Each structure stands twice: as structure tokens, then as C-alpha cells.
């Protein structure tokens, strides 16, 4: 199955750590599902708001909130790895959802910030935008954990988020290598990410 192949490129897909979908499991584990759904939500928001060229650094409030969202996945992951507690599906999907929703902002800042330019356009105009994005991402993860009929939609969304995230890293690399050349960086990056993940997924299955 295509979605399973794409998920295999980046995720262990352990059945006991994944949500059920149909007769099997979702293409990504609970934590990765949260991460990549959050990533897709954030990228969709930034695209709709025409912020893909934004490069102004975060406000203090946005920077603090963004940093705080990284803590849950680190604490839960390390705590369960070292045996301090046993993580569960809710903790996995929520910690993934929170960090996934803030990663695209970091990527945009890394790609677009230019100390020689004014960097006038903000990634988030108000901290409220970031808060709402986080609530929506976490809400979808919580709904999935509750058993709401979201598995099919979020399975597709998570794989799209996977392509967007790795496409973002390719985009960052291309922008650094090519400088100010006017090229369709985003389209090239998404195509490269898709092909790379598809090939790796096939090798990992």
C-alpha cells in the first residue's frame, strides 16, 4: 500500500505504538502521526496566509511558546526510553502534535531570514495564531485517541506532512546552495522529498 510504503521511510511502524485503521494500523506510529499532521496543518496555514516568504524572528512570546512545545516530546521520549515511566498513545500523539505544529515556523525562519534585509514579514502576526494552530493540532490528535472517525483522513494528512517536512529540509539546502537564484525551489523540493521517501520506503519494507 502506498501510504504504508511512505510511512516506512521514516517510522518504525510498531503495531503496539500505532492507531488502528481498518484491518491494520495507520501508516505512521502515534507519535509520528501527531508530528506530521501538525506539520501539514502549519504549512497549510502559512500557505493560506501567504507567509512562505516570511523571515522576521519570533516575538519573545512566540519564541517561548515554541520552545515549550519541544519539551513534551523530549521529556516523554527520554522518560519512557530510560524506563522512568511507560508512555501511552495519548502522550505520544499529543507530544508529536505540539512539536509538529511549530517545526515549519523554524524552517521558514532558517530559509528566509536575511540579516542584510529588513525581514519585515512575520511568520505569525500574533501569538494567538500560534496558539490556535497548536490547539487544532492537539485537538485532532486527541480526537484520534478518543476513537473519532479520523484515522483515514489523518493517515493521508500524516503522509502529506511527511513530504512537506522533508521537502522543507531540501528547500533549506537548495536555498543555501543556490543563493538568490530564481528557481522553483519549493516545487523541486517537494518532488525530491516525495521520490526520496518513496524509494527509501520501498527499501525499508
Descriptions of predicted regions:
Residues 1-18, 24-25, 33-42, 46-205:
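Secretory/periplasmic and organellar redox-cofactor proteins
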Amino acid at each position: 500500500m502506498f501510504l504504508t510504503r511512505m510511512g516506512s521511510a521514516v517510522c518504525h511502524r510498531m503495531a503496539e505504538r500505532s492507531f488502528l485503521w481498518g484491518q491494520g494500523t495507520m501508516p505512521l506510529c502515534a507519535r509520528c502521526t501527531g508530528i506530521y499532521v501538525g506539520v501539514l496543518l502549519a504549512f497549510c496555514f502559512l500557505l493560506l496566509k501567504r507567509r512562505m516568504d516570511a523571515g522576521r524572528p519570533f516575538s519573545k512570546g512566540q519564541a517561548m511558546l515554541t520552545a515549550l512545545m519541544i519539551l513534551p516530546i523530549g521529556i516523554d521520549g527520554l522518560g519512557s526510553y530510560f524506563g522512568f515511566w511507560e508512555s501511552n498513545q495519548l502522550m505520544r500523539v499529543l507530544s508529536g502534535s505540539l512539536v509538529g505544529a511549530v517545526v515549519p515556523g523554524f524552517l521558514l525562519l532558517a530559509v528566509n531570514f536575511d540579516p542584510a534585509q529588513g525581514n519585515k514579514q512575520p511568520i505569525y502576526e500574533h501569538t494567538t495564531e500560534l496558539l490556535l494552530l497548536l490547539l487544532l493540532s492537539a485537538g485532532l490528535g486527541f480526537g484520534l485517541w478518543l476513537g473519532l472517525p479520523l484515522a483515514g483522513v489523518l493517515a493521508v494528512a500524516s503522509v502529506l506532512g511527511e513530504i512537506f517536512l522533508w521537502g522543507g529540509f531540501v528547500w533549506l539546502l537548495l536555498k543555501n546552495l543556490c543563493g538568490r537564484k530564481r528557481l522553483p525551489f519549493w516545487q523541486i523540493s517537494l518532488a525530491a522529498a516525495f521520490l526520496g521517501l518513496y524509494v527509501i520506503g520501498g527499501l525499508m519494507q
